[in-house]
């Protein structure tokens, strides 16, 4: 029983870290990267689909994203989706190819992004701690019902705390790396 709880906690904590990583990929850092726009929803024959399903996205010269739609008819819809996004990007269309030059980040924008990063990191830490709290409550409940001994309860709580510390450290490392990338001129 305790092993199942610990495995469940580990799985849920890993998911929290993965969600934080996914959030980090969506933040613009001045470098061109396909993950910045691949999640944008494009109106494709009446249904909303991710950009990556209607076009290929490549990086050109490190600072330009190149979008090659698979159908010429979807060029306008892709442009519209990019304009509607809050990324502050300006697409330039040449025939069927859309180029998006990445403007350099201002110091003010870097600080804003850094604040957003810290906020997202705190949300991820809270999510990990919530998993820990749920598991600790389950362990205490098992102790009350005499399903586990007090020694097993303490051991399990210590292991869950170690898991929590490890995943929070992972979040901190991801945050530090992304902040360094954002603040780099």
Pin down the residues of each PLM region:
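Short, intrinsically disordered, mixed-charge
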Residues: 22, 80-88, 119-123, 133
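Glycine/charge-rich, flexible interdomain linkers and switch-proximal surface loops
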Residues: 27-44, 49-60, 92-104, 135-142, ...
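Generic detector of leucine side chains in alpha-helical contexts
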Residues: 2-5, 24-27, 36, 40, ...
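Positively charged, low-complexity, intrinsically disordered RNA-binding extensions
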Residues: 98-185
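Glycine-rich active-site/cofactor-binding loop and its immediate structural neighborhood
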Residues: 63-92, 96
């Amino acid at each position: 029983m305790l092993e199942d709880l610990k495995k469940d906690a580990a799985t849920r904590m890993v998911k929290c870290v993965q969600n934080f990583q996914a959030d980090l990929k969506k933040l613009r850092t001045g470098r061109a990267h396909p993950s910045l726009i691949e999640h944008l929803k494009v109106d494709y024959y009446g249904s909303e689909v991710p950009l990556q399903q209607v076009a290929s996205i490549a990086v050109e010269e490190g600072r330009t994203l190149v979008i090659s739609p698979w159908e010429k008819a979807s060029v306008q819809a892709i442009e519209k989706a990019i304009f509607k996004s809050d990324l502050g990007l300006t697409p330039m269309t040449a025939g069927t190819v859309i180029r998006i030059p990445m403007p350099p980040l201002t110091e003010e924008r870097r600080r804003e992004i850094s604040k957003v990063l810290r906020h997202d990191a705190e949300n991820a830490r809270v999510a990990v701690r919530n998993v820990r709290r749920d598991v600790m409550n389950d362990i205490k409940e098992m102790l009350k019902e005499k399903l586990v001994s007090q020694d097993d309860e303490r051991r399990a709580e210590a292991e869950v705390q170690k898991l929590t510390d490890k995943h929070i450290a992972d979040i901190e490392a991801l945050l530090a790396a992304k902040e360094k990338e954002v603040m780099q001129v």
